[in-house]
From Swiss-Prot:
Disulfide bonds: none annotated. Keywords: Cytoplasm, NADP, Nucleus, Oxidoreductase, Phosphoprotein. InterPro entries: NAD(P)-bd_dom_sf (IPR036291), Sc_DH/Rdtase_CS (IPR020904), SDR_fam (IPR002347). It comes from Schizosaccharomyces pombe (strain 972 / ATCC 24843). The keyword Isomerase does not apply. PANTHER family: ALCOHOL DEHYDROGENASE. Its main location: cytoplasm. The keyword Nucleus applies. This is NADP-dependent 3-hydroxy acid dehydrogenase. The lineage of its organism: Eukaryota, Fungi, Dikarya, Ascomycota, Taphrinomycotina. SUPFAM superfamilies: NAD(P)-binding Rossmann-fold domains.
């Protein structure tokens, strides 16, 4: 029996990468209701079918763009009754666009990153938090990044968004200490996902170079850490976790084997 059994878990950015892997890791060990939210509805529909065919879970695929801030309250309020009583929110949706230095910054890309990574995460939290306060318990797990702790050239906006996530998470934790609401953050280092393809606007060669001759983490590695955090006893909060592959020591400190 898992401590997650019977819970309703909402994951944003669930169509690929860490979000998708987290859904599978949870489904393997717990009888839960999963709400898989993403912009690519057809993709989360297929994931939902696969999960329900393999595991004892109920899955609701949900079309959601967290950058559409005004739509979020309505989406949460209109959830089907059997999925409305959310117990866990995993704020995973996020992206990086470009590696421009500030002098060359694409402001449209900056607005997209800030809206998605920061305001979207805040809006999701704001929409779900009343459910948790009403029962004095619930889990919010925000997926951050090493970039929120250590900046690098070409990452000014993305690093800023993840720093903002960290401070928001910390403040929320302080605001909820008189409850059983747990506020957690998991910060991955180098993870091989679609993240870099998106960052380089679909240029797969540039994306592949990010991981070239290195041994990055997989989405499953981070999903396992998320599952661990969520399955601790209710009095235990895995507040802030940094996860590196064994050959990484910092944002720009990655050992690469000689070709």
């Amino acid at each position: 029996m898992s401590r997650l059994d019977g819970k309703t878990i909402l994951i944003t950015g669930a169509s690929s990468g860490i979000g998708k892997s987290t859904a599978f890791e949870i489904a393997k060990v717990a009888k839960v209701k999963l709400i898989l939210a993403a912009r690519r509805f057809s993709t989360v529909e297929e994931i939902a079918k696969e999960l329900e065919s393999k595991y004892e879970v109920s899955v609701l695929p949900l079309k959601l763009d967290v950058s559409d801030l005004k739509s979020i309250p309505g989406v949460i309020e209109s959830l089907p009754k059997e999925f409305a009583d959310i117990d866990v929110l995993i704020n995973n949706a996020g992206l990086a666009l470009g590696t421009d230095k500030v002098i060359d910054l694409n402001i449209d890309d900056a607005v997209t990153m800030i809206t998605t990574n920061v305001l979207g995460m805040m809006a999701m939290t704001r929409a779900v938090l009343p459910i948790f306060y009403s029962k004095n318990k619930g889990d919010i797990l925000n997926v951050g990044s090493i970039a929120g702790r250590e900046s690098y050239v070409g990452g000014s906006v993305y690093c800023s968004t993840k720093s903002a996530l960290a401070q928001f998470t910390s403040a929320l934790r302080k605001e909820t200490i008189d409850t059983r609401i747990r506020i957690m953050e998991v910060d991955p280092g180098l993870v091989e996902t679609e993240f870099s393809v998106v960052r380089f606007h679909g240029d797969k060669q540039k994306a592949d170079n990010v991981y070239k001759n290195s041994e990055p983490l997989t989405p499953e590695d981070i999903a396992e850490v998320i599952l661990f955090a969520l399955t601790r006893r209710e009095n235990v909060v895995i507040a802030d976790t940094l996860v590196f592959p064994s050959h990484q020591g910092g944002a720009n400190h990655v050992y690469r084997k000689q070709a």
